[in-house]
């Protein structure tokens, strides 16, 4: 199948299984619930382990259900290869660990998911990898923060929880000038609304648990290799360019070519630490992927109507959504998201924690839980939950106030959502 000639809505249904299953003629992708695979002979086994034959070796590394999912997400993002793992957190961790060692450094936007902030601020430093967090509103901050030992710049297409937007092309240019890759989390953006690789990003990560799965039922993460970054020419990434002593002495840039980055994660990090996605979860996430465009269109449509409702409500102090003309990222929103975006955003209730929690506790349709991007509408109070590990200064720097509430707008009928929001606000 010549995927470049097909539209997104077709690719999300067919890539990876262009023909029915060869063993059963099944149209749906089968769940290959197996741990291991039979080699034809000793030479065949050696070729698989030596990466001369790209087939399955062991269930911790590859699975045919997983393979279809990986190929499909990679095609939708415009990348050369994908790797599915057990969670979005695992995807981010592997993406950064793959090209860093003790003594290395990362530059990250500070307006990111609290779990990723914690990884960069507390967990990775225990392994000798430090991070400088910068205010992405001033692009010069990225340039100033890059050091000789910096190995990556990390951002999100839409920040969590406030859906701030960063000039991807400008940050990519800065990173490439210093011969380092731009890694971007496109969980909130989705490849339907934006394909960061087309704007200069080198590696894309997702929590597939969110919009890709879409129904809050299965954990999963994906790493997509853009295939354009020249790891050898950079001279900063011996992990990919020199003989690997724990994998037959191969050079990943030679053995895997444009897919060297994700191939090393699969061959080394996934092999040794095992954050493997289950075949069943890969199947469930594939099911979600097939309706991604339809769901995201409805998410965005509903979100814009909720924003319009909230900005006029007397008990709302502020709405943080880039579609609003007064939002500081509105121009970037129009540039990078011509079809709209940000069904996950925050607003500020007048008062503080007490008022915000009163509003949340009186919602009837919105579910209070630690997830987003479900077809069901969700709500949470970031300061006391998802970002509770941050101190007051860090919360302020990320734009999270005592009265901040995060909404994830689902696909219910918009009239029902507006009625629910109105009655809960009336309880304050």
Where are the regions that the model predicts?
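Active-site beta-loop-alpha junctions enriched in small/polar residues
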Residues: 158, 187-189, 324, 350, ...
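Short conserved active-site loop signatures built around small residues
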Residues: 1-32, 223
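Conserved small-domain helix->loop->beta segment predominantly found in fold-type I
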Residues: 273-276, 280-282, 287, 291, ...
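Conserved N-terminal alpha-helix of the aminotransferase class I/II PLP-enzyme fold
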Residues: 41-90, 115-122
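PLP-dependent enzyme catalytic core of the Aspartate aminotransferase-like
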Residues: 9, 80, 121, 130, ...
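Short hydrophobic/aromatic beta-strand micro-patches
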Residues: 224, 346-348, 408-410
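Conserved PLP-enzyme active-site core in the AAT-like
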Residues: 2-3, 16-20, 83-312
